[in-house]
UniProtKB/Swiss-Prot annotation:
Gene: ccmE
Primary localization: membrane
InterPro entries found in the cross-reference section: CcmE, CcmE-like_sf, NA-bd_OB-fold
Subcellular localization, as worded in the UniProt entry: Cell inner membrane
GO molecular function, one term: metal ion binding
Annotated GO CC locations: plasma membrane
Protein purpose: Heme chaperone required for the biogenesis of c-type cytochromes. Transiently binds heme delivered by CcmC and transfers the heme to apo-cytochromes in a process facilitated by CcmF and CcmH.
Binding site for heme: H123, Y127
Pfam family, one: CcmE
Membrane topology of this protein: Single-pass type II membrane protein
The organism of origin for this protein: Nitrosospira multiformis (strain ATCC 25196 / NCIMB 11849 / C 71)
Protein name per the record: Cytochrome c-type biogenesis protein CcmE
Family per record: Belongs to the CcmE/CycJ family.
Amino acid sequence: MKPRHKKLAIIASSVTALGVASVLVLNAFQSNLVFFFSPTQVANNEAPVGKSFRIGGLVEEGSVKRQADGVTVNFLVTDTAKVIPVVYTGILPDLFKEGKGVVAQGKLASDGIFRADEVLAKHDENYMPPEAAGALDQADKARKTVMQ
C-alpha cells in the first residue's frame, strides 16, 4: 500500500470512528432528556403520551388520597388554570403537602392520568422550581384575562 493510500485509509477510519462516537453520544443524550410541562400544557395535549417528562405545579387542596396498600397515592396537580390527576407509588417526600409546590416525573397514560415515577417537593416555603413558578404565573394571567 502506498503512503498516499495509507493516509486516506487513516483519515477515512478516523472520520468513521468520529461519526459513530457522535451518534452514540447524541443517542445517549436524547434518551436522558426530560422536558417540563405545566398542567395547562398537558391538558392542551402538548405533552407526549407514553414518554417521560416532568409536570409541576401545586398539589390541589383536598386532593391527596392514599390507597389501601399504603404506598400508592393519588393527587391532583394544578397551575390554577388546569388540573391533572397523578398516581404515585412510593414514599412521598416529607415536604409533600396539599397547596404546596411539587414536580413529578413520569409518563402520561392514554387515560389522561400522569403516572409518576418520582415526586419532588419544594424544600422551603419560598422555593418553587423556576419552570413551575413560570407556569403558575402564565396560568394565573390567562385565568384573570378570561375572567375580565
